[in-house]
Amino acid sequence: MADGLNMGNLSLNDSQHAPAGPGNTGRAAYIPPHLRGRAGGANVDAAAAAAPPPGPAAWNGPRQGAPPRGGNWANANASDFSPRAPSGPNGNNSWTPSEGQRRPFDPHAYGHPGHGGSYGGSQGASTRGSGDGQWRDGKHIPGPANARLERELFGVPNDPTKQSTGINFANYDDIPVEASGQDVPEPVNAFTNPPLDDHLISNIKLARYQTPTPVQKYSIPIVMNGRDLMACAQTGSGKTGGFLFPILSQAFQKGPSAVPAQASGQMSYGRQRKAYPTSLILAPTRELVSQIFDEARKFAYRSWVRPCVVYGGADIGSQLRQIERGCDLLVATPGRLVDLIERGRISLVNINYLVLDEADRMLDMGFEPQIRRIVEGEDMPSVNERQTLMFSATFPRDIQMLARDFLKDYVFLSVGRVGSTSENITQKVEYVEDVDKRSVLLDILHTHGTSGLTLIFVETKRMADALSDFLINQRFPATAIHGDRTQRERERALEMFRSARCPILVATAVAARGLDIPNVTHVINYDLPTDIDDYVHRIGRTGRAGNTGIATAFFNRGNRGVVRELIDLLKEAHQEVPSFLESIAREGSGYGGRGGRGGRGRGGNANRDVRRMGGAMGGGAPSFGGGSYGGPGGSYGGGSYGGGAAAPSYGGGYGGASGGGGSYGGSYGNPSGPTGPSSWW
């Protein structure tokens, strides 16, 4: 009966079940499945005898013609640790050296503390950064090209997820530029060496950048000449490249800084637990630091510089492991950076460059105590021993006064109508009562369709979720982003928006501050902000890099506090001013507008260097509040900075009747002290 059971050549009389030999003294050796049923009666016993026995010793046998085994984590280019190498099982070589080939532990194989900026760069070994470049014998040696990584960082030609320059990019040459300070360097007109490093220029070409923008033309020589900088440039004008290009170029030319001598006792398995970055970039939101980090990876490709990013709301363990592998350029939010400093995992003693991006918000909206602690309360070099760079689209006067504490002999750079908007953006203002906003929004979306990306701004987190759900119920593919969402939810929402799977994004202004999202064709201010500077930043999400865009604002009498500034903004950008705005402005002449926060915005000369304006911030100073546009009183803080010994209170109602009234910024939920919660990060 056994002879009849044969299913697909599997028989009970198979050799693996047959007696081993005469007398049935034992069973045959086990036959692996891939050797069963071999034609011609292969000598399976010999094959089985040749098979390696189980256990770790099987992998340690001597090899002929193969490189010596060994692990060198700091040298990814070593032939015995390359993925899918030709020798070894599964294409991988041994993890354990064989007897006779075992080498003594070499601490220098993991990176020498004097040769890698922070951790890596072991005497000629790769730091495994953005492209495995090296700093060896005082020279920068770029790593080999990596086609997969190039596609990830730079995309492919005509990649829809990578925005190219628009039809109006050439108009940037007509933008007015004002640079004030002593001995301002001459601008550059092309990406050339000098002043830039050749390797950086090759990465700029990979990114398909043709010519520098106005802010880059001036910031590159200013930073390369060792000067501090306060730069104002309209949204979408290339500010990120304005500080990354000179910082990375000098890093490629000068090499890493030596780790302090006392750090040598902090090594663990050849690695230091504490990072010693040479450049620090601070920004207010998680999304913005991630965006800057992506740009840093792009331009540090194939170099020895390893960029890292840390921010709140994400797993701190993975961020610690990231900086342990090497950290030369650190992009961070202030809160998470303070946390890592307290944990003893980051030292600022080697900082050569400090960058504050969106600096006006960083200093104004509750981060000032944390920034002062980072800059003045830790081991960061003093203002005279480092370069400090501040970038933003708006720099109101009182924020300039605060910023002077962090700068030395700086150059003030004003590019374009700072605090204004690009003429590439077509601005439309519609009179819409609150109860009609949803129906008008649907009309706009049906009219414009979803061919491009549409960004809708609301004031509250609750409204962001409610409006997103409403649009989904109306069969519009929408998603939302705000401060109460987890970091993973925010990243997923942004990714779906960037890839156009959800071409409509509902966002709070704080969450989307500074984001460079390609191909946003329409920005809708569903809730108009109470601050004209916020309006500038919101609509600046479109019309970037010379591309054109549309910005629509829903206006009603509840927004009359910004009506005068809005009219001035529209006139400056040569946009149509609706008649209802003029009539409401005449009705509300008693309000006078706040001129930005407490009179700091457009009425406060947000694009002028305060050093050239004369006067002090005391009693004889020009009036800032509503006084720029009428209204009683009007002196900022009652003629003194802040109106008292405590932190300044911005406003005092419309017209800025006194600086002592009503604190601004409370609506943003930010702390007055360093330990309070913050909705910014």
UniProtKB/Swiss-Prot annotation:
InterPro entries assigned to the protein according to its UniProt record, in alphabetical order: DEAD/DEAH_box_helicase_dom, Ded1/Dbp1_DEADc, Helicase_ATP-bd, Helicase_C-like, P-loop_NTPase, RNA-helicase_DEAD-box_CS, RNA_helicase_DEAD_Q_motif
List of residues binding ATP: 233-240
Annotated Gene Ontology cellular component terms: cytoplasmic stress granule; spliceosomal complex
Cysteines paired by S-S bonds: none
Ranges of Polar residues composition bias in the record: 89-99
Keyword Cytoplasm belongs to the record: yes
PROSITE patterns: DEAD_ATP_HELICASE, HELICASE_ATP_BIND_1, HELICASE_CTER, Q_MOTIF
Catalysed conversion reaction: ATP + H2O = ADP + phosphate + H(+)
Domain Helicase C-terminal: 424-585
Gene3D superfamilies: P-loop containing nucleotide triphosphate hydrolases
Biological role: ATP-binding RNA helicase involved in translation initiation. Remodels RNA in response to ADP and ATP concentrations by facilitating disruption, but also formation of RNA duplexes.
Record-given protein name: ATP-dependent RNA helicase ded1
Annotated source species: Aspergillus clavatus (strain ATCC 1007 / CBS 513.65 / DSM 816 / NCTC 3887 / NRRL 1 / QM 1276 / 107)
Gene name tied to this protein: ded1
